[in-house]
C-alpha cells in the first residue's frame, strides 16, 4: 500500500515557484510506495528573523497540517530548517511529523564529530541557535557562517547559482579548514540547488536537509514509529476552528500582495 507524505511549504506561492521546491524530490531515492505531495501554507511571515515571525509561521503551518490524517496522509515533512510548526503539529496528530533542522543536526553527528552550518543570511542565526539549544548541541556546532545574501524564499537560487554557489563553497571551506567542521549542514531547504556542487567541491559530507527529511519520514513509517505522546501531549480542549479562522483572515490580508516581492517589504 502506498504511503502519502505531505510536504508543507512555509510560504504561499505560485505553481511555478512551487516547482523549485519540488526539485528536492529528485535528490533522494525513495521507495516506489512513497508519494510526496507539496502544499504551500495560506499565510506566513514575510521573513523568519524574529519571535513574532516564528509564531506566525507556527500557526500557518499548523493550519496546513491539521487535517493531514483525515486527508489520507501518513506523515508530514515541514520544508524549513526552522522546524516551524513541527512541535505543535505533533501535539495534535498521531502521524509522524518531521522537521529537517533536527534531522540534519542529529544525522551530522552520525557522520562526524562536529558540524558547521553554512547559510545565506545572518538574520537566520537565531533559528539555528534555537534548535541547537533545544538539542543541547551547541558544543557540537563548530561554527555558523553566512554569505550575507538576502534569500529568495520563492525562486530560491534559480538563475543565481553562478554568483551564490562560489560564495557558499568559500564559506564551507573556511568552516572545514579554520573552524574544524567534519560535516557541512545547509542552513535552509532553499539552498538545495547548491548541494550537488558543494558536495563535489568539498572534502567532507554535505547534508541536504529537505531530501534527508523525506528519507527519515519513509524510515519512520517503515518501522511503524511516531512521536511520543509523553513529550507532545494533546490539548485538553482542541480549538482547531480558531486556527482555521485566523489563517483565513490572514490569507485575505495578504491576498493582493505580490508573491515575488513579499520578502523585500520592510527589509
Language model regions located:
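Short, acidic/small-residue loops that bind anionic groups at enzyme active sites
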Residues: 90-111, 198-217
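Glycine-rich, highly charged phosphate/nucleotide-binding loops
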Residues: 51-67, 163-171
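Periplasmic-binding protein-like
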Residues: 8, 70-80, 180-189
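A C-terminal functional module that forms or caps the active site or interfaces directly
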Residues: 183, 189-200, 206-207
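Active-site rim beta-loop-alpha module in soluble metabolic enzymes
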Residues: 134-187, 194
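Conserved beta-alpha
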Residues: 100, 104-138
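N-terminal glycine-rich anion-binding loop in soluble enzyme alpha/beta folds
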Residues: 1-56, 122-159, 249, 255-261
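C-terminal functional extensions of proteins
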Residues: 211, 215-216, 224-267
Amino acid at each position: 500500500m502506498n504511503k502519502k507524505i505531505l510536504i508543507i511549504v512555509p510560504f504561499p506561492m505560485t505553481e511555478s515557484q512551487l516547482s523549485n521546491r519540488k526539485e528536492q524530490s529528485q535528490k533522494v531515492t525513495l521507495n516506489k510506495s512513497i508519494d510526496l505531495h507539496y502544499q504551500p501554507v495560506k499565510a506566513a511571515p514575510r521573513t523568519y528573523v524574529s519571535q513574532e515571525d516564528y509564531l506566525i509561521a507556527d500557526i500557518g503551518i499548523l493550519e496546513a497540517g491539521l487535517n493531514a490524517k483525515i486527508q489520507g496522509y501518513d506523515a508530514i515533512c515541514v520544508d524549513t530548517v526552522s522546524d516551524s510548526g513541527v512541535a505543535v503539529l505533533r501535539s495534535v496528530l498521531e502521524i509522524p511529523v518531521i522537521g529537517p533542522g533536527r534531522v540534519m543536526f542529529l544525522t551530522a553527528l552520525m557522520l562526524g564529530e562536529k558540524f558547521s552550518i553554512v547559510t545565506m543570511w545572518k538574520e537566520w542565526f537565531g533559528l539555528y541557535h534555537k534548535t541547537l539549544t533545544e538539542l543541547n548541541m551547541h558544543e557540537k556546532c563548530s561554527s555558523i557562517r553566512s554569505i550575507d545574501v538576502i534569500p529568495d524564499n520563492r525562486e530560491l537560487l534559480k538563475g543565481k547559482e553562478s554568483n551564490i554557489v562560489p560564495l557558499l563553497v568559500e564559506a564551507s571551506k573556511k568552516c572545514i579548514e579554520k573552524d574544524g567542521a567534519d560535516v557541512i549542514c545547509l542552513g535552509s531547504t532553499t539552498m538545495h540547488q547548491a548541494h550537488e556542487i558543494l558536495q563535489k567541491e568539498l572534502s567532507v559530507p554535505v547534508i541536504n536537509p529537505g531530501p534527508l527529511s523525506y528519507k527519515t519520514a519513509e524510515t519512520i513509517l517503515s518501522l511503524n514509529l511516531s512521536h511520543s505522546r509523553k513529550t507532545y501531549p494533546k490539548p485538553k480542549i482542541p480549538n482547531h476552528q480558531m486556527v482555521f479562522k485566523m489563517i483565513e483572515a490572514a490569507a485575505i490580508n495578504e491576498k493582493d500582495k505580490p508573491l515575488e516581492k513579499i520578502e523585500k517589504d520592510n527589509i
